[in-house]
């Protein structure tokens, strides 16, 4: 027997009546002879099947609505216990964390390292304190960027092919890094 494509889930039927008169159930297929059934009987059977499919389709819709209501009810069960009713959605929290992480790890460390490079010997006490605090706050991001940022001008000797090569004449390379105790800030300009 066909179930008209049903899922096998039905809404409960009403309880039978408690009346005492017996019911006689007649089968819709009363075949008393071995001959071919007439057209009216086939027409009645087709109408019954169509009606059953319509009823089952309505039951499926009702079941889907009930299932949706149950899922909506158990979506946030902790709200009834904790009383937190205005919690942020997970998508907005993840988006905020992503924006802050990009700013913390990708945007600020190169800016801070360039600021340290440019103002290294020209800073006063307050600027040195600010630079220290920014380095302290953004230390993980600076550690990630440090191997990739190199502000020194390489190669210093035009004869060197790679920055890690040894120069042929080391005395010809101008060294400006050891002037600090007696240097003026202009001595450290990298032009």
Swiss-Prot record:
GO terms for molecular function: oxidoreductase activity, acting on NAD(P)H, quinone or similar compound as acceptor; quinone binding. It catalyses: a plastoquinone + NADH + (n+1) H(+)(in) = a plastoquinol + NAD(+) + n H(+)(out); a plastoquinone + NADPH + (n+1) H(+)(in) = a plastoquinol + NADP(+) + n H(+)(out). Keywords: Chloroplast, Membrane, NAD, NADP, Plastid, Plastoquinone, Quinone, Thylakoid, Transit peptide, Translocase, Transmembrane, Transmembrane helix, Transport. It comes from the Eukaryota. GO terms for cellular component: chloroplast thylakoid membrane; NAD(P)H dehydrogenase complex (plastoquinone); thylakoid membrane. This is NAD(P)H-quinone oxidoreductase subunit L, chloroplastic. Coiled coil: none annotated. Disruption phenotype: Malfunction of the NDH complex. It is a multi-pass membrane protein. The chain crosses the membrane at residues 61-81, 93-113, 129-149. It comes from Arabidopsis thaliana (Mouse-ear cress).
């Amino acid at each position: 027997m066909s179930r008209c494509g049903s899922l096998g889930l039905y809404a409960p039927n009403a309880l039978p009546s408690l009346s005492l008169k017996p019911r006689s159930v007649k089968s819709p297929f009363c075949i008393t002879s071995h001959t071919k059934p007439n057209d009216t009987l086939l027409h009645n059977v087709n109408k019954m099947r169509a009606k059953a499919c319509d009823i089952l389709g309505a039951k499926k819709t009702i079941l889907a609505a009930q299932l949706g209501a149950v899922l909506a009810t158990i979506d946030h069960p902790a709200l009834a216990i904790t009383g937190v009713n205005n919690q942020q959605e997970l998508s907005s929290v993840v988006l905020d964390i992503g924006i802050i992480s990009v700013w913390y790890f990708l945007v600020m460390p190169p800016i801070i390292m360039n600021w340290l490079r440019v103002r290294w010997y020209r800073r006063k006490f307050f600027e040195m304190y600010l630079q220290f605090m920014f380095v302290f706050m953004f230390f993980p991001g600076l550690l990630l960027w440090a191997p990739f940022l190199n502000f020194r001008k390489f190669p210093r000797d035009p004869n060197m092919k790679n920055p890690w090569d040894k120069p042929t004449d080391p005395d010809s390379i101008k060294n400006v890094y050891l002037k600090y105790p007696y240097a003026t800030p202009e001595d450290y300009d990298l032009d």
